[in-house]
Amino acid sequence: MSYKIVALPGDGIGPEILNGSLEILQQLSKEFHFEYELESHDFGGIAIDNHGKPLPDSTLNACKNADAILLGAVGGPKWTDPNNRPEQGLLGIRKALGLFANIRPTTVTNGTSHLSPIKEERVANTDFILVRELTGGIYFGEPKQLSENDALDSLTYTRDEIERIARVGFELAQKRHKKLTSVDKENVLSSSKLWRNVINEVSQSYPDVEVNHLLVDACAMHLITNPSQFDVIVTENLFGDILSDEASVIPGSLGLSPSASFSEQGPRLYEPIHGSAPDIANQDIANPFGMLLSVAMCLRESLNEDKAADKLENVIYQLIKEGKTTRDLNGNYLTSEIFNYVKENL
């Protein structure tokens, strides 16, 4: 079977970290005998320069017909028109593809625990996934109102929205350690009362998965004091936005965190969580690990190449353990050198 992959290098450090990662993907495809077709398209600021908008029709059509999308990074200070921002392309692609679930792994290995700002004994063996609902909640609820003296935001969720994000969480938990933690604010929010009820109902279809409920404030505390207790966390949009940023500091660098966005049946989008870092672009000093780990997620979740994903992840964490890292991880290695080391160790 041949897969269709669309590459969106984007802006800033995006092209250099994605293009190097695509060479790694090609090497893995030869070793593990899988085939794919690759297309590269403009997206974000570069698309504004070349096409007048951040998400050209040609890019969107290619994404709709893909099995997976790999995104480098988007944005930068060059593009200042508030009505035509590079980041609007990301919002557009999420909406067009129905990307409703954001998946954020947080992993700390024996070789990376020294990088964390939290004590090593607290973060040792941390390995969890945070599943955030992307399309509902207070960011999108209606009505919204702003006046000089008062303001209104609406936190709304439907049963269907909660059920579909719950199933993503339970499916991931079934493939991992069979533990799911649902995070809400059930003690004060009506939307969270519905959230908890639906989670409990969906859990009946997954009797092998252990379910726990945590209030969001308690979860925020446990992420710092005992992050290794978690396997899969599932939560709504606002809580997930905050908790995923909190979780991103646990490994010690934004450059170590991949992410994915899932639709119900269409293509999935994979990207590192860091920004475009235009101040270090084209200097061969960008950290490529987040992009490489996003490729590993793509291998596992979209291409069903678990062994290739495992091998790539193992090589990455071994290099970090050996201190072969970029300067943001206190290393002295160039981006190109990291890619060469990955190729050699594969």
From Swiss-Prot:
> EC number(s)?
1.1.1.85
Q: Which cofactor does it need?
A: Mg(2+); Mn(2+)
Query: Mind telling me which InterPro entries this protein's record contains?
Result: IsoCit/isopropylmalate_DH_CS, IsoPropMal-DH-like_dom, Isopropylmalate_DH
Q: Which Gene3D superfamilies match?
A: Isopropylmalate Dehydrogenase
Q: Name one GO biological process term.
A: L-leucine biosynthetic process
| Enzyme superclass (EC) | oxidoreductase
Annotated signal sequence range: none
Where NAD(+) binds, per the record, is at 76-87, 275-287
Q: Which domain of life is it from?
A: Bacteria
Which residues are recorded as binding Mg(2+)? D217, D241, D245
Where is this protein localized, as stated in its record? Cytoplasm
- UniProt keyword list: Amino-acid biosynthesis, Branched-chain amino acid biosynthesis, Cytoplasm, Leucine biosynthesis, Magnesium, Manganese, Metal-binding, NAD, Oxidoreductase
Primary location: cytoplasm
Chain segments annotated as transmembrane: none
Hey, which pathway is this one from?
A: Amino-acid biosynthesis; L-leucine biosynthesis; L-leucine from 3-methyl-2-oxobutanoate: step 3/4
PANTHER family annotated for this entry? 3-ISOPROPYLMALATE DEHYDROGENASE
Q: How does it assemble?
A: Homodimer.
The protein depicted here goes by the name 3-isopropylmalate dehydrogenase
